[in-house]
Each structure stands twice: as C-alpha cells, then as structure tokens.
Amino acid sequence: MRIALVQSWLGEGAGEPVFPIGLASLAASLPGHEVAAFDPNVAGPVPMAALARFLRDFAPDLTGLSLRNIDSTNTRVNVSYLPPFAATLTTVRRETAGPIAVGGAGFSMFAAALMAAYPAIDFGVALEGEAAFAALAATLASGGDPSATPSLYCRDASGAARFTGEAAKIDLSGLPSPDFSILPMAPYLAVPWGVGVETKRGCALSCVYCPYGFLNGRRYRAKAPAQVAAEINALRDVHGATRFTFLDSVFNCPSDHARAVMEAMVAAGCTLPWSAWFAERGLDRDFLELARRAGCDTVIFSPDAFGDAALKRLGKASSVAEITAAYELVRDLGCFEVSYNFFKNPPGQTLAAALAMLRFIFKARREMGKKAHFELNAIRVEPHTALARLAEEEGLIAPDADLLKPVMYTQKKTAYIEKFLDVLLRAAGK
C-alpha cells in the first residue's frame, strides 16, 4: 500500500516545530509498504495548500494522521490545536480517496470524543500505534475486517465508533528504531531541547494529574541500551542533530536501566548534549557524574509542590527534603543547567508551602543565576487520571465531561495563592 503519514498542523504562531518521533516510529514498523511523511508545521506560509499538493502527488491508499496534543495546556494563554487539526483532517479528506486513521497521544486520551466530533475519521488508533496501525494496513490491503484488530476505533453501519479492545503492550526489544529519515531533520534543529529519543515506555509512578500510566502502562518496558546509543549516534552522524532530549516520563526510574543506557552511550562515543526529566528520590552524585560524562547538560525536575502535604496529595514520590537534596547535588556539581516545574495551587497547597516554594526559587536563582529555570503552571485536568476523579468529586467537572475544552484545577480554599502568583508572573513579564 501507499501510506501517507501526516502530522497535524498546530496553527499559526505555534512556536518551534518538534520532530514527529511518532511518525518515525510508525514508518519503521511498515516494511513492505511505500511510505511518505508530511509535517505542515514546517511547510511554509500556506501549510494546507502544501499538504494538498503532497497528497495529490503521492496519492495514498491509507493516511495516518497524528494528533500529539489537543491544546497548549497553558491556563493564561491556552491555545487549542483542534481547529488546525480539523483543517488538516478536512484537507486529507478532500484530497484522498482512501481511509483516514488518526492516532497519537492527544487522540488516545480523548478518542471516543474525537471520533464522535469528527465523522471524517474512519479509524482511530488508540494508545501504542506501531502494531495496531501496521495490522490495520495489512488488513485493508488484504480486504479483511479491521474490527478484528485490537486497539482500533472502527465505525459500524450507523457511523458510530466502536473500540475493538486494548492490545497487549509492545515488547520494545522487538521494535525497530525510528526511521529518522522519514522527514528532513534541518527544520527541527532550532528547537532548544532537540530531537526526542526513547529508552523505555511505561511509568510506575502515581502522579495524580499525569496520563502516562494510561497511555503507556504502569510497567516499564526497556529498549536495549546499545540500541539507544546507536540511535543517538545515527541522529548525529546521519541526520545532523545537534542535541536531543530523552522522552521517558522520568529518565532515572528505574535507575539501573538508565545507568546501563548512559554507560552504553559513553562506550559508543555519544557526544551530543542532552536533557531529561529526573526524579529527585534516589538521585546521587555518581549517577549525575555519569550523566555528565554521557553528555547531559540540563537536568529537569517536576516536583510540582514544595510542601509534603501537597506532594502526598499529588501522588509524588519525593519529599521536600529530597527535592532540596537533589537541588544541592546539581548546584554543587556546577556543570548542569536545571529546570523546575511547580504548580501554583495544587491539591494540598498551603500558604506556608507556597512561600517556601518562592524562597526556594529565589535561593536557586541567587546561587545558580541564569542556569536555574522555573515554570509556574496551573494543572489541566486530563481524562483517565486521579485528578479527574478528584475534580468530579469536588464538582469542578461533570461525571460525563469529555474535557476537550480545558479545565484547570485550582484548590478552592487557597485560590488566592494562584491569583497572587499570577500577579507576580505578570510583573515578571511571563
């Protein structure tokens, strides 16, 4: 089959484009098919016209459309990606005769609602896409019945979408490396954090706001360290990448696999600088020194709160003492930039904890200067999370809310804290 893989347009002014690693992974899992990819986010000033030309020239039998996120999740300047997604879908529908399958993390989290809202979608690929999309392509090529394929949304005779049931999680040891040649790398090199590299899937942590457990499962599934190192060197030597970031939900969990990956990188001569999300608990000097030898120059933490009560309500694995100790390790080594994410008014927030967070931020900026970075955000209520259940219990959302329109959680009794922090952020020009 001729298969087109298309990244959804994010709209005008969406910022630096991110290399579509999902499409690269799909392409690598489609041997025997003629595959071409298109990203309207790097297609110039008239992206839908460029997409239409690509589709007319390639004439696909099947088109896969990736929806990575449905909005920017920023509460003060929230940008919905659904209107540009609709424009992308309309263009694909108009220019192609074959079926359209939509997948990606954004689609998977809101699959039923999106299938209902956009009847132009023929099939939905839920959760991990490599095996399900390849099976869909094979079934369509042979004239079979796609409704027998797991992890698909298929339409019945009335047009209603039916889910075929979740498939078993993919064994990453048998998954080929992403095909990074599916699109030119050059348009993505300006992204500050670089191209994404995956060492594992799954997350055993229990953060109440996070959908990663739903998307990838609670059990870690690891790639071979040597394969990860080979992918990194190929990004540098073949595709011209200048840096990368690890896509793992938390890089150093489990720490033994992360150590093995970094040791393989050192042995393979990986020289690209990189960043990753780290958990504070269990982080030690030896691990960070190995990370530096392997090329890490930026450590990213997401403690989210600075009070033990709020950390417990958020389902975080670390304590304030561990957050402080991890910061001191990074500061004392002196060879990293560090970035932090905090929520302004999470469950369990107190005035004392908010003030302690501000003291921590000012202390870190005083000690590390411009090498310390901070983001203060609201929490978007995502489906399939414990926070969604809490928001329902508190009357913030209805039991049947599809959450396509963003809802931000703020603890009612301390709502003044978020308002105060918003004033500070505006004064700082953020």
Which ranges hold each PLM region?
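Charged helix-capping and loop-helix junction motifs
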Residues: 78-88, 259-260, 316-322, 356-357
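Structural recognition of alpha->loop->beta junctions
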Residues: 113-132, 293-298, 360-376, 397-403
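Radical SAM [4Fe-4S] cluster-binding motif and immediate context
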Residues: 173, 178-337, 344-346
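N-terminal [4Fe-4S]-dependent radical SAM core
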Residues: 1-3, 9-11, 155-196
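Glycine- and acidic-residue-enriched helix-capping/strand-helix junction motifs
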Residues: 12-23
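Catalytic cores of alpha/beta
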Residues: 111-118, 287, 348-362
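C-terminal accessory regions of radical SAM enzymes
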Residues: 2-13, 156, 189, 337, ...
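Glycine-rich beta-alpha loop elements in corrinoid/cobalamin-binding modules
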Residues: 29-166, 384
